[in-house]
């Protein structure tokens, strides 16, 4: 129920966010002043003005209207809504998830605050166009022929891009909270609790009547053991999924995965773990981590441990809070970066385009840029030659045919930025030859919310029911065997002589006591 509740509250967060974005007051002020003035005075002769063209094109990207939050009250309302729904989202998960969800809620609020701050700036543009002719006191003909005045004004504020970048961050965090809600860690399932309670309620009366009804109690205990064991064997005792958070890669030399699946989302991987009895744990890998740097994989990897997995070899030894930072996405093209530049080699660019922190290489100049509030140049690849296009990527140029049409390629090592190298495709026959190192000034981005996760099935309830069933079964078998091998009638007959022998002894003492009475009287 916690999973469903957390999903619902996350949906409410999204709706509240969409509502405040829809109802916010926009402050877009675009002014275009146009004027064309002809002033001709005191001219003795003909005045001919021919072919005058006055053209103006004003293009306004309406997405910039979503840039502005004009009032502080709108910002406050946004943050209040997010904070309220964040509390509801956290309450929908148990304490095992509290730290993770709290961190993501904090990231969500931070992203929203950043977005509202960026969008607070009004998108104001002003275009003034003037064309003026002033002819004064000219004696003779005045001919103005083929005059053209063309101006193209493209009003596209970078704030729209800022808003979309932050919106992607908020949407990713909401998605992660929802996924974690789907795979919510929980304690004992109510069904398991019922089974344990029944065992206790049945076992207590049986213990009290141990000597009184072996024939009835023994089979009943044995039946309880069989039922509990059957429930465990048939999978009726739930095995809730628990999330341990970030973990280093499992040691596959000690434990081979039962299956490895590519491209699964976290939700789909957890669902597969739940539905497959032969799987005991899951390592969901979304980043390749080396040292303090992580690079996002083009496809996720889901490693499923067998049911009898060894936690010591599968859980890894990574810290609960990842210390690494993420290498940004790489893009490339010719000229200044546009809204949707092409992804670099070895990097699958998202449909939404570059995110804040991603880098772009201008192949015509060798200059590279990093996206912050806007694209800013960070440096130029050394050795660039005019007329030769530069390309870059994270793949070895000698292992792919995709670069055969290139001549100069910068191989970027995402784990060691200072070791990026330039390769030339030259020679006869042509082959890739390493030239020189190419240090890059590209900052790493923050730790992601969709990092590698370790998930396992909790066998606590299964073990409790299993051993309770074993105990009940053994006790029931022992009682049943004793009832069959030593019935009540045999036991009574064996015990009766000892009781009878004691009776005369008690009676023998009576005369002695009685003899004393007459003597006392005499």
UniProtKB/Swiss-Prot annotation:
Disulphide bond pairs: none
Main location (coarse class): host cell
Localization, UniProt: Host membrane
Keyword Transmembrane on entry: yes
UniProt entry keywords in alphabetical sequence: Host membrane, Lipoprotein, Membrane, Myristate, Transmembrane, Transmembrane helix
Region annotation (Disordered) ranges: 503-522
Lipid sites, type N-myristoyl glycine: 2
Transmembrane segments: 193-213, 217-237
GO cellular component: host cell membrane; membrane
Keyword Protein transport: no
Membrane topology designation: Multi-pass membrane protein
InterPro entries referenced in this protein's UniProt entry, alphabetically: Virion_mem_poxvirus_L1
Domain of life: Viruses
Coiled coil spans: none
Reported function: May play a critical role in virion formation. Essential for virus replication in vitro.
Name by which UniProt lists this protein: Putative myristoylated protein 053R
Organism, as annotated: Frog virus 3 (isolate Goorha) (FV-3)
Biological classification of the source: Viruses, Varidnaviria, Bamfordvirae, Nucleocytoviricota, Megaviricetes
């Amino acid at each position: 129920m916690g999973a469903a509740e957390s999903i619902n509250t996350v949906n409410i967060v999204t709706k509240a966010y969409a509502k405040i974005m829809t109802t916010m007051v926009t402050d877009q002020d675009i002014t275009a002043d146009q004027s064309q003035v002809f002033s001709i005075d005191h001219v003795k002769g003909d005045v001919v003005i021919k072919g005058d063209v006055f053209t103006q094109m004003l293009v306004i990207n309406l997405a910039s209207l979503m840039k502005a939050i004009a009032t502080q009250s709108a910002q406050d309302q946004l943050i209040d809504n997010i904070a309220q729904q964040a509390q509801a989202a956290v309450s929908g998960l148990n304490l095992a998830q509290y730290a993770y969800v709290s961190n993501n809620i904090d990231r969500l609020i931070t992203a929203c605050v950043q977005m509202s701050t960026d969008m607070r700036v009004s998108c104001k543009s002003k275009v003034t166009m003037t064309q003026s002719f002033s002819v004064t006191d000219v004696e003779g003909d005045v001919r103005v022929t083929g005059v053209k005045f063309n101006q193209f004004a493209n009003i596209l504020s970078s704030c729209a891009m800022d808003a979309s970048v932050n919106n992607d961050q908020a949407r990713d965090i909401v998605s992660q909270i929802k996924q974690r809600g789907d795979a919510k860690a929980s304690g004992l399932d109510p069904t398991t609790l019922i089974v344990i309670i029944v065992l206790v309620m049945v076992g207590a009366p049986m213990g009290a009547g141990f000597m009184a009804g072996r024939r009835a109690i023994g089979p009943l205990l044995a039946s309880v053991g069989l039922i509990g064991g059957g429930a465990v064997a048939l999978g009726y005792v739930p095995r809730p999924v628990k999330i341990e958070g970030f973990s280093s890669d499992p040691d596959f030399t000690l434990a081979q995965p039962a299956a490895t699946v590519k491209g699964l989302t976290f939700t789909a991987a957890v669902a597969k773990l739940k539905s497959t009895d032969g799987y005991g744990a899951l390592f969901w890998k979304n980043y390749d981590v080396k040292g303090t740097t992580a690079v996002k994989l083009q496809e996720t990897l889901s490693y499923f441990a067998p049911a009898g997995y060894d936690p010591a070899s599968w859980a890894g030894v990574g810290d609960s809070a990842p210390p690494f930072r993420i290498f940004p996405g790489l893009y490339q093209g010719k000229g200044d970066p546009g809204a949707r530049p092409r992804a670099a080699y070895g990097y699958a660019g998202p449909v939404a385009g570059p995110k804040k922190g991603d880098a772009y290489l201008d192949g015509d100049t060798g200059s590279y840029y990093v996206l912050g509030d806007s694209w800013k140049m960070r440096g130029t690849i050394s050795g660039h030659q005019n007329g030769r296009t530069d390309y870059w990527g994270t793949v070895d140029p000698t292992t792919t045919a995709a670069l055969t049409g290139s001549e100069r390629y910068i191989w970027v090592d995402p784990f060691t930025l200072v070791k990026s190298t330039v390769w030339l495709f030259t020679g006869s026959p042509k082959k890739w030859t390493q030239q020189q190192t190419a240090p890059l000034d590209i900052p790493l981005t923050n730790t992601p919310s969709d990092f590698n996760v370790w998930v396992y099935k909790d066998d606590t309830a299964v073990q409790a029911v299993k051993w309770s069933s074993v105990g009940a079964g053994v006790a029931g078998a022992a009682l049943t065997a004793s009832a069959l091998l030593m019935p009540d009638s045999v036991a009574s007959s064996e015990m009766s002589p000892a009781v009878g022998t004691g009776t005369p002894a008690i009676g023998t003492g009576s005369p002695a006591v009685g003899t004393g009475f007459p003597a006392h009287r005499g």
